[in-house]
Amino acid sequence: MANPLLYSPINPQFFQPLLPGFTNHLDIPVAFFLKYLVGTNVGKTAELRSDASEMTWKVKIDGRRLSNGWEDFTIAHDLRVGDIVVFRQEGELVFHVTALGPSCCEIQYGEDTLEEDKIEKLCGTENVSSKKKSLKREAESAPDNSLDSCFVATVTGSNLKRDTLYIPKEFALSNGLMNKYQIVLMNEEGESWKIDLRREAYNYGRFYMRRGWRSFCIANGKKPGDVFAFKLVKNEETPMIQLFPMTIEDLDKLQSLPRHKIRKTEAAPSSPDLSSFVATVTASNLSRDRLYLPKTFIMSNGLLKKFQMCLMNEEGESWTIDVKHEAHTGRFLTIRGWRRFCVANGKKPGDLLKFKLVHNEETPVLQLLPLNSEDLHKLNPSNDTRHGQSLKVTKKEFLGMEATENEFLGEEVYCNDSFKASEKDTLPFAEPINEDIRQGQCSQTIKQEYVSTEEKNSTSQNRFVTLTLTHSSKLNLPFEFMKRNGIKKAGKITMVDRYDAKWRTSLLMDKIGTMSLGRGSKGFCEVNGVEMNESFILELIWEDTVPLLKFCSKV
């Protein structure tokens, strides 16, 4: 059931994702501060409350920043990087705080935690603060005997060959190994090996040891199939984990022990997942080699000043693409790389793709995830762009305004060829023709003055032409082919890709009469899977007096 506290129509609220270093302070969003707090918080203290405890935390406000006392609140609520905190104002400087996990599910706290808070409340706020800080230091310097301080490892042929061992993410996080770069492995006799510790920038940030795992196994006679456990015995600048033997009975006991978790993240979702979005592949965004990103996704994840992103498929392969923010429209889009990603992964117009932000550092990583029925229900039918056609697009979700598809994309619709030649020459790239616009809005037949209607009914063998993509990306059309099909003048021509999406481009002619396809032909080849120096076959098809070059196959 959704938490009604997150949907209060009366009390103003704001949310903030927790980034590295969040325990030192938290900044209040500018818009919220200017509207509700400016002028009322100078040198004052805010009161924070939550459903997890009956306590009230007093936190100093320095300008827009929550400072002294904030760390105590984060420790008491076991807040971590990636969590989201929602503040609801209940008084001038009184806030109710709800903590959400990375999946935007409300964090649930165990009963023992609440009882401890009740006891600590009787001791006074200052004692609680010092007690929690001392407990934190003890946990870092002397690991306890709980299951969180150990893990089971299996030697395999693969991890020996790769000299890499993946360690449980829960073990690494619960013991504060996120910022550690080396770890010491110690055997039962006390001999030690220093090994590198790393965290992947993808695959949900898995932790692994490398450059030394193989040496450790060989020195201790460990072979594929052996199972043993490591226990964290020292957690300082360089953590130390010690090997201890595992019998079948020990393994069964270890696996059957219930894990004591302070918090649960499997509660029913109480807020939309701000770390993911669903995109639609269209003929338009393929030809333009760009994808517009939801503004809510960009803003909520702090990506406003990012200039590159990494798109990763389900197999872990990645593509780096550029990101651009249009200051005059407020739109966010990817440029140079979107088409390459789609082609490499066999994505075609009409496909729906779900991306999730799995790594948010210098270069954010968006991973492709499988769609489920819940994701499909989130799509607004009026924004459906499947089958390569933009049925209706608004930028209301980005800018709070309505616009037609072409206004949103900054395009103009021409219903005939009466526009000026200078305007035609400025078209930046080949662009798929929206079938609805061509049939429903453009009632007049496009006139092709360069076509000889007497000669357009050529024989079937004259309809096919083979071209080769070269480094110059210039696709010249053979003179005999053009002559036999009655195309004698430069102008506009339409290309049809393997997905039946139509691309409008220019038909150019040089001084000696050689005709070639204009800008956009390289993108057309990329969508059709044609690589450099590969040849492919096009078929000439006529629609009334309009010639179309349809992609047939690669040679």
UniProtKB/Swiss-Prot annotation:
Disulphide-bridged cysteine pairs: none
Primary location class: nucleus
Location in or out of the cell: Nucleus
Sample GO molecular function, one term: DNA binding
Residue spans binding DNA: 11-103, 150-247, 276-372, 460-554
The entry's keywords: DNA-binding, Nucleus, Repeat, Transcription, Transcription regulation
Gene Ontology cellular component terms for the protein in this record: nucleus
Designated name of the protein: B3 domain-containing protein REM10
Biological source species: Arabidopsis thaliana
